[in-house]
């Protein structure tokens, strides 16, 4: 599987551990940075990776910042991208099977490398539960607002 990886300065070490794990499993990794030699701001890395995953250039993505939360918020602004902060393997599996997440975000300051590898494995080894009742799940009311942003909403008021 072709997996995009990215991190801010707080996630470089964990991203590298995840990358080595994925390469050992035979995955292709597209590392967009940052690195110890070339740190990049979290928002820049997130936009680039979300673009690659949203366009299909990468099948899945893993982003690592201080807590994972900021990158998830930004990634979810991209069309066709569902990103979830995952702090354990069960959450990663549910993010895939129920929410169809294609990017997970991890906290470089709060997630141990061994746990990150378990989380990534659960994420990659779980499929989306297709065939579920979207109407009962309330997907349509959410999709109506898919291109809304905070700024568009406050301008209307």
Sequence positions of predicted segments:
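Residues at secondary-structure transition points
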Residues: 9, 13, 37-44, 66, ...
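A short beta-strand-loop structural module common to alpha/beta enzyme folds
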Residues: 28-40
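Short, structured coil segments at secondary-structure junctions
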Residues: 25, 78-79, 99
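Helix-adjacent hinge/juxtasegments
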Residues: 45, 49-85
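C-terminal binding/interaction regions
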Residues: 4-6, 10-11, 89-157
């Amino acid at each position: 599987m072709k997996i995009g990886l990215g991190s801010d300065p707080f996630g470089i070490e964990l991203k590298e551990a995840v990358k080595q794990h994925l390469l050992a499993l035979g995955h292709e990794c597209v590392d967009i940075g940052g690195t110890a030699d070339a740190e990049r701001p979290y928002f820049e890395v997130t936009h680039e990776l979300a673009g690659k995953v949203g366009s299909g250039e990468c099948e899945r993505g893993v982003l690592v910042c201080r807590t994972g939360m900021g990158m998830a918020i930004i990634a979810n602004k991209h069309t066709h991208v569902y990103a979830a902060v995952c702090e354990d393997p069960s959450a990663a599996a549910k993010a895939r099977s129920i929410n169809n997440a294609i990017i997970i975000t991890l906290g470089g300051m709060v997630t141990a490398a061994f746990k990150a590898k378990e989380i990534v494995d659960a994420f990659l080894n779980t499929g989306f539960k297709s065939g579920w009742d979207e109407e009962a799940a309330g997907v349509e009311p959410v999709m109506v607002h898919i291109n809304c942003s905070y700024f568009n909403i406050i301008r209307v008021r």
